[in-house]
Amino acid sequence: MGIIKTLDSTISNKIAAGEVIERPQSVVKELVENAIDAKSTSITIEVEEAGLSKIKVTDNGSGILEEDLELMFRRHATSKIENEHDLFHIRSLGFRGEALASIASVSKVRVTTCHDGSIGRQIDVIDGETVNRTLAQARQGTEITVESLFYNTPARLKYVKSLHTELGKITDIINRFVISFPYIKFTLVADGRVLIASNGNGKMQEAMAVVYGMKIAQDLVEVNGRTGDYEVHGFIAKPEHTRSNRHYMSLFINGRYIKNFMLTKAILSGYHTLLPVGRYPILAINIVMDPALVDVNVHPTKQEVRLSKESQLMELIERLIKEKIWKQNLIPKVEKKKVLETFQQQKFEYDLLREHRDKTKQSDYSEQTAVNQIDEKFKEQHKTAQLDKQRVPDGESTQKTTGFISDSAAELDTTSEILPEKNESSDVIENISTDTSREKRKIPYMEIVGQVHGTYIIAQNEDGMFMIDQHAAQERIKYEYFKKQIGDVGLEMQSLLIPITVTLSKDEAINLNKINILLKDIGIHLEHFGGNDYIINDIPVWFPDNYEETVQELIDYALQHRQIDLNKFREETAIMMSCKKSIKANHYLRITDMNYLLEELAHTVEPYTCPHGRPIIIQFTTYELEKLFKRVM
């Protein structure tokens, strides 16, 4: 007698439930997808104890025929497909016929439905078996109640997370449905409390306001585009609205929420250097395509998909994001609330200091001495600013300068420490010019006012006040300069009087052949000198002054990223060089140098962020300043 046996339906359904029904969120997802497939325009989800105790999904869809009530709980019973051709032309969210059978095998289910105005029907299913069937009063549509989830699979129940975590998972999937199907009214109620309520008016941007809040929704940028095979529509947030993970990036194909690494990569390439390292944008993009071009039958959850002509879709998404995002004003404005919080904290600290001073009964003489010291610093600073103003050429005589009180008296000792002599300034600003077209400025004209802490340039125009990070500004300028030079096929080289010697380990020497193509592309030619030593006799003329350190870092980077493509290596090289060569914090500049820096920045391709994605310019509008000082209410 053989030992291989056919499992009965109860056991096989519980096995299938292990893949399909992982947690309460899985039940909610499957039931809501069925409601959407039933052409519902209103769907209400009610959960108790994060769905473990009870999940009820009510819709106003087409309802279920009487003869289908019991059949719907059989495994692989579905109304969505009939043959193999249908499997590759799926337009519905559900199609596998596994979900309801899996749910019924690990819970107690009640279905109440009314189809096309007929008499209502009700059926109770426990452990996959029908235990009751009767007539019932019911509105048009279907109501499915799932109770005691995982009551008969204690091992699965043991690994369910906290109620807070599970409710968060349910909220997340409903948020995706709200965005993907804005024409459906969704309501999520948890333990009697309404968590989500969309209006179902068909507008994706308003649906995103329900999920992400009005402030972000108002700052969204719409993207639209199509090719012969794909149509893309959605909304993307400006780079100032980012998150620490990809959780806020929603991709949909024909309304189905999916996860796809290559499409995510295309999105990030569209933002390019606008995003800070480790930050991700907020967006929702729906892709409409022929179902024959997408295979959703990859995993029971149906979130992983395989795409035909994937590279074309990637190019379309990347191009649309680039075209839209770079047309926006990407200078972030300061939030009044955050500024006020800072002021209030400073006031609190000042009040504590004053209270302490009163308790210790500090003498009036001590207080006056402190005031005098500050006054002397201000006078010295003002004197320095006047000296600098005298050095400015006639053409710059109209520039205004303002002194800022320094925390350290040592910074105020001499004029040269605050404003370097001309040869120092020119060394700081050298080689930052790019050959970028000068036809159009990307940032507004502004008048330099001064500098704070040798780090931030203060400027103004009729629209308000601007703060510019001088390091980030020059980093952007140099990045575009170096990137252009590195991409030049005719590299102009200079011979070194003393060759650079590089010593590699055995492992590095073995892998050297793999990275030589990368190094040669940017003008680094390693010649074997003996043993593990290599020499470099020539470098490109545009290489930074500290070329030995730069060369070593580039070799190290290439060895660590041997699989990197050529374009990515060029970009990383430009980023590395621009960062090291740019002026740093606590470096004081002349007004003329600040003007030159801003003028160069204005004509870069992307003047809003440094290559690492940090903002370069922040704006305080005149209205915001007036509100801070209570000039307007």
From Swiss-Prot:
GO terms for cellular component: mismatch repair complex. It comes from the Bacteria. GO terms for molecular function: ATP binding; ATP hydrolysis activity; ATP-dependent DNA damage sensor activity; mismatched DNA binding. Pfam families: DNA_mis_repair (PF01119), HATPase_c_3 (PF13589), MutL_C (PF08676). Keywords: DNA damage, DNA repair. One of its GO terms (biological process) is mismatch repair. InterPro entries: DNA_mismatch_repair_CS, DNA_mismatch_repair_MutL, DNA_mismatch_S5_2-like, HATPase_C_sf, MutL/Mlh/PMS, MutL/Mlh/Pms-like, MutL_C, MutL_C_dimsub. NCBIfam families: mutl, PRK00095.1-3. This protein is involved in the repair of mismatches in DNA. It is required for dam-dependent methyl-directed DNA mismatch repair. May act as a 'molecular matchmaker', a protein that promotes the formation of a stable complex between two or more DNA-binding proteins in an ATP-dependent manner without itself being part of a final effector complex. Belongs to the DNA mismatch repair MutL/HexB family. This is DNA mismatch repair protein MutL. It comes from Macrococcus caseolyticus (strain JCSC5402). The gene is mutL.
